[in-house]
Amino acid sequence: MKKTIIPALFFACCAPAAGFAHSAYPLAVKAEKGNGADFMHALRTGKTAQLKNITATERTALEFLYRYMPLADVTDYSPEFFLDNVRTSFMAQKEMPWGGEVPELLFRHFVLPIRVNNENLDDSRMVFYKELKDRVKGMAMKDAILEVNHWCHEKVTYRPSDGRTSAPLATVRSAYGRCGEQSTFTVAALRAVGIPARQVYTPRWAHTDDNHAWVEAWADGKWYVLGACEPEPVLNLGWFNAPASRAMLMHTRAFGDY
């Protein structure tokens, strides 16, 4: 799927179209084996003890995640892991003051998903929510974004590397990461408190053969730019503002029909 965003060309990578609550779409994992496929079958039939206390909203959210997540995630992580993440997402939506302001489309694509890049998935949503919920309590949404980024800066500093992107909790444990890891970490932290967020990446600047990744977060009807773990007093301010305005290609990931 391709979308044009001013001032740069912006590509959102997604799976084929299907509605969030649509029950007739073909199941992507129906031919696969293992806990993930078994659980998806149980979601459709209601035949499992795991679903005794699941709500209709949680069921729909799980169907969306399983429909669009990478196949490796279906087989690598347990159904309980995804259910815990779904429940924490809805808890944040209920308890954070901006929860009711986030449109369903944005919640579905930029809060609910766990994956940001090619990192291993972990329990960061639950951990980050417990640590951040009181810190941003009572704040306006834009102020909360800035505060979360301050918190991220306290946890992680920049260090270049060429390895695979580390998981958010692994980044916290090491206390450092490159821009791709810092932005993955910051997106995970923002999503943990119910703020729509996405990683934005340019593979090459106009002025040099180098790349960069940063964060966009949504508040009050608009997307705002911020440098991950690089706190500023306001949004839409970063050292990369000028080169980003001249970048020819930027992309992000959006799982589902967005």
Regions found by a protein language model. Name each.
Residues 14-15, 43:
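Prokaryotic Sec-type signal peptides and long signal-anchor helices
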Residues 177:
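Catalytic beta-strand/loop cores that center a nucleophilic Ser/Cys/Thr
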Residues 22, 130, 134-135, 139, ...:
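Hydrophobic/aromatic-rich core segments of domains that either
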